[in-house]
């Protein structure tokens, strides 16, 4: 008699079930569907009050059969908390970060109740992927860019006066969306004029870091261990379209600074408790942590330069087998 497969929930980008490629998540779905009783649920489609999620099953050909709204129950739940691009107000949240925190609390509720046996990443760990978590770290110990939160624009003005400019970054965000480089008092005024008044962000949605030039480096983790790295030179930023020096290459042992960067990334990952995700550098400083929704590939235009999906799949399939 065949052993009963373990039930696994996998939260995915909602656009995946409508046909978007989403290669990292599709790789996971294909592999997990062979080894587990897999239920796919979509980020942004949680009914927080009723305690239900919108669920799907993978069908032949990579399509998805809707199962309706179900109560989460599984041996393992692999979560995805990167819905920063979704409209939080349409989901009943006045503040963007409240939408994020509701997801963290939702996962924790079902973990604590025993309805879900294990969550990757653990809810508290996903909570530490907010950039504001860096504000409580000793930047000298963890090689992070000093990070600040501000309760007023006057505090932002003070930060600009104290250095060579700052970067305002959404506390919960990615891909440079909503980021601003503030070099002067007039930059801060314009930034302030764009906040609130029914717009997408408020001051409390932002964190602030000193502007640091440098190459962008990423170290991917699966199971708490480094599985790949990449180095990006001369990429676009929210304030510059210049790509004269643009290049992407694997970042591996033997390259300049790799060993020191890896030690710093591993130290921060251990402190955070990160199981699946990535740690990003600008120059020689860590500027953010990415959680379980991280894309595990890097492309240069149409060419895949780094593909860390196999390592992610091995880890997640291994986690199922250990249940």
State each model region's role:
Residues 175-271:
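Phosphate-binding site of ATP-dependent enzymes
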Residues 16-33, 39-147:
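Conserved N-proximal alpha/beta basic substrate-recognition cap immediately N-terminal to
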Residues 82-85, 171-173, 292:
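Short glycine-rich anion-binding loops that position phosphate/pyrophosphate groups of nucleotides
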Residues 3-9:
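Extreme N-terminal starter segment of soluble prokaryotic enzymes
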Residues 124-176:
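Hydrophobic alpha-helical segments and helix pairs
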